[in-house]
Amino acid sequence: MIKITLKDGKVMEFEEGIKISDIAMKISPALYKKALAAKIDGETVDLMTELHKDSSLEILTFEDEMGKWALRHTGAHILAQAVKRLYPEVKLAIGPAIDTGFYYDFEADFTFTPEMLEKIEAEIKKIIKENHKLERFELPREEAIDLMKEKNEDYKVELIEDLPEGEVISFYKQGDFTDLCAGPHVPSTGKVKSVKLLSLAGAYWRGDENNKMLQRIYGTAFTKKSELDEYLNMLEEAKKRDHRKLGKELDLFSIHEEGPGFPFFHPKGMIIRNILESFWREEHTKAGYQEIRTPLILNEALWHQSGHWDHYKENMYFTNIDDGDYAIKPMNCPGGILVYKNSMHSYRDLPLRLSELGIVHRHELSGALHGLMRVRCFTQDDAHLYMTKEQIKEEIVGIIKLIDKFYKLFGFEYFVELSTRPEDSMGSDEDWEIATNGLREALDSIGKEYRVNEGDGAFYGPKIDFHLKDCIGRTWQCGTIQLDFQMPERFDLSYIGADGEKHRPVMVHRTIYGSVERFIGILIEQYAGAFPTWLAPVQVKLMNITDAQYDYLKKVEEALKENNIRVEIDTRNEKIGYKIREAQLQKIPYMLILGDKEVEAGKVAVRSRKDGDLGAISLEEFIEKIKNEIKVKTN
């Protein structure tokens, strides 16, 4: 008999060799019906996996991230099967699950069309109805290559040949279709209830522009049609809110072919950026942080010492100066560490909180670039905290509270994830255990709900990730707290303890916005470009009906500017209705309309983006109203 520990801590005994699907049935028939995959000792596996030793088990449904992943991974295989049935000469490349669904890349001597997608979708429905079992099998390297050569699948052959010697080479079979795949998958095609093919795109093989351009079909999958319909409605809303479209319409930023992945911020975009950074600085000063600035370019040796060279080299840019090798920083931490090392520190100095709005550069493949969300140059709102082991819990709690304050200001709900040790990591088991427990205890002490993401920590330590949920239900990972015992060791950091001896500090890396650029992109979409008054690049649009009000308009403009209210004037010889419509398209919070009546009464006619026509009030009353709105940062 083997002992299986369930997620709730309950221990059950079963015969050795029992399948996970059978355990799900014994736990509850309702759970068995919803089950899609499982986690065994933190590793995601198929439900048909047999258990031969004592293990911890979590049954995954569509409510779980990896349950969704397994279902959508199977959706990609169903798409490939449908394409091969309809167009047998097409060659298969890769087809993974992604956050929003799945895709598959194909090589074809024709171009897929929207009409073809409809035909493929109809075939997908047939395959789902046929309810084929997904059966995993493994082959030795040469047999695996022969199988794919026999099927004329050149890309699969290349993938197998690139695998390390001794790597397990697995396949999944469903009906008449077999694909190279590590899994996991759901038990049968019938589990994938609702599929929708969404779009077509070009994609270079392996993301390399020197390789052949393939055709990518995107899709998504759900267990219920109602969930699919809700998602499709969200996509329509997301199109209206696309920050790339609104960024252009509202004149906030642009990206040019002379610098792909390097955003250009325009004056209005800079206003938003400066407000976010000023607020960040104010709150960090209140919370006891000291701001630093470190160079963009640092010697290559530093990146070897930090470990970034081994773990991050492919994402870095390099240059040569005075016959020396240098790298443009992809992260701020090594530079921040040099600031710490520049002085001797006593235990009385700790915790030491150093913050930096540091520009970093990371190489992203051209196909992955996406407006402000995925760029090659961005400002990371970093802070690095140095502390004793005894201070870990209190400092982590303080960071969580600061992050919470920021996200609530912008009206974001969020969820928290604790990510544990990855395979590619540095440091001892003991350090990782202390670090992980430190983060866990901080979360538990303030009653913050979280889920555990096994194996997704940074290479130098475990982390807490904060995922924002926007107003249309999408999630964005922004803030992070990473506990690090490794960097202090690598850089021989120390402080003098109460005993007069040298001790090693604990280091914490953390961000709140994550990337300032990306956070602005998220805000553009969160507000659909209609920023709250305190954040709006233009807070008031001032317009006259005829030239007769021009002198009064200039006096009103001057009064607004004296009160630090951002105002634009529209004195064009256009109909007032046209001016109003244009200001509405620019999503400006307030319009002040001046006609002869307003001049005579010394008032302003106020039109609010939110509440419509507010009538005529004194200029002093309006200034008091808007200043209060800005002060309290009303959303």
Swiss-Prot record:
The keyword Flavoprotein does not apply. Pfam families: HGTP_anticodon, TGS, tRNA-synt_2b, tRNA_SAD. GO terms for biological process: threonyl-tRNA aminoacylation. Belongs to the class-II aminoacyl-tRNA synthetase family. Catalyzes the attachment of threonine to tRNA(Thr) in a two-step reaction: L-threonine is first activated by ATP to form Thr-AMP and then transferred to the acceptor end of tRNA(Thr). Also edits incorrectly charged L-seryl-tRNA(Thr). Gene3D superfamilies: 3.10.20.30, 3.30.54.20, Anticodon-binding domain, Bira Bifunctional Protein, Domain 2, Threonyl-trna Synthetase, Chain A, domain 2. It is found in: Cytoplasm. The gene is thrS. Keywords: Aminoacyl-tRNA synthetase, ATP-binding, Cytoplasm, Ligase, Metal-binding, Nucleotide-binding, Protein biosynthesis, RNA-binding, tRNA-binding, Zinc. It is an enzyme of class 6 (ligase). Residues 1-61 form the TGS domain. Homodimer. HAMAP family: Thr_tRNA_synth (MF_00184). This is Threonine--tRNA ligase. The keyword Zinc applies. Its cofactor is Zn(2+). GO terms for molecular function: ATP binding; catalytic activity, acting on a protein; metal ion binding; threonine-tRNA ligase activity; transferase activity; tRNA binding. It comes from Clostridium botulinum (strain Loch Maree / Type A3).
